[in-house]
Amino acid sequence: MSNFVAEKSIAAVRAVDEVRDGMLVGLGTGSTAAYAVKSLSERIKHGLRITAVATSQATEALALRLAVPLVPFQQLSAVDLTIDGADEIDDRFQAIKGGGGALLREKITESASTRVIIIADSSKLVAQLGKFPLPVEVVPFATEFVRARLSALGARVTVREAGGTPFLTDQGNYILDAALDEIPRPREIAAAITTIPGVLEHGLFLDEIDTIMIARGDMVEVRHRGEA
């Protein structure tokens, strides 16, 4: 097991320690979030009583396989706690997410959550966002139009593919990966992208995150929004 893989697991275990009986828990998507689902499953085996909501079909399949009880988000208006990973996160609790292709459902679920914990290995904490391409979910009809608008913002844009064809999100949409190299003013970029017709969501998470748990070796650094 590589250091980064071990760190993901350690951070996940620490985050799942925050889950209490009776909670409705949001389950993120991606390799790091999968460790949280596995850790949650172990706690359920030892008597923890919770229900969960998945942010993707992939996470739903994993949760069902591990006997984590699920409810559909369509029946919900609020979530107690969501645990998820990030592709990049900075000291201001701003993150790029969507490498796993579930940014729209993640944004909805985390906006509905009383608390959001982001777990990550030490490589994900950055001084400035932007080295990881910014995912943008788009209506397929608007792909080339949105690509041109993103290019006008200075991005190098590619259509995400899987098996030689465009990757489809769980909603049947496309993802454009916008490489910007650096994003010194994330709110300006987020606002500009949001105004483009055909864009459904972008992967900048600027206000949703409450707690960051970054694993470094065998230790987990916990940071809370608003702390000095």
Swiss-Prot record:
<dbReference type="GO" id="GO:0004751">
    <property type="term" value="F:ribose-5-phosphate isomerase activity"/>
</dbReference>
<dbReference type="InterPro" id="IPR037171">
    <property type="entry name" value="NagB/RpiA_transferase-like"/>
</dbReference>
<feature type="binding site">
    <location>
        <begin position="84"/>
        <end position="87"/>
    </location>
    <ligand>
        <name>substrate</name>
    </ligand>
</feature>
<dbReference type="InterPro" id="IPR004788">
    <property type="entry name" value="Ribose5P_isomerase_type_A"/>
</dbReference>
<comment type="subunit">
    <text>Homodimer.</text>
</comment>
<feature type="binding site">
    <location>
        <begin position="29"/>
        <end position="32"/>
    </location>
    <ligand>
        <name>substrate</name>
    </ligand>
</feature>
<feature type="binding site">
    <location>
        <begin position="97"/>
        <end position="100"/>
    </location>
    <ligand>
        <name>substrate</name>
    </ligand>
</feature>
<dbReference type="Pfam" id="PF06026">
    <property type="entry name" value="Rib_5-P_isom_A"/>
</dbReference>
<dbReference type="GO" id="GO:0009052">
    <property type="term" value="P:pentose-phosphate shunt, non-oxidative branch"/>
</dbReference>
<comment type="pathway">
    <text>Carbohydrate degradation; pentose phosphate pathway; D-ribose 5-phosphate from D-ribulose 5-phosphate (non-oxidative stage): step 1/1.</text>
</comment>
<comment type="similarity">
    <text>Belongs to the ribose 5-phosphate isomerase family.</text>
</comment>
<dbReference type="InterPro" id="IPR020672">
    <property type="entry name" value="Ribose5P_isomerase_typA_subgr"/>
</dbReference>
<feature type="active site" description="Proton acceptor">
    <location>
        <position position="106"/>
    </location>
</feature>
<protein>
    <recommendedName>
        <fullName>Ribose-5-phosphate isomerase A</fullName>
        <ecNumber>5.3.1.6</ecNumber>
    </recommendedName>
</protein>
<comment type="function">
    <text>Catalyzes the reversible conversion of ribose-5-phosphate to ribulose 5-phosphate.</text>
</comment>
<dbReference type="GO" id="GO:0005829">
    <property type="term" value="C:cytosol"/>
</dbReference>
<keyword id="KW-0413">Isomerase</keyword>
<feature type="binding site">
    <location>
        <position position="124"/>
    </location>
    <ligand>
        <name>substrate</name>
    </ligand>
</feature>
<dbReference type="GO" id="GO:0006014">
    <property type="term" value="P:D-ribose metabolic process"/>
</dbReference>
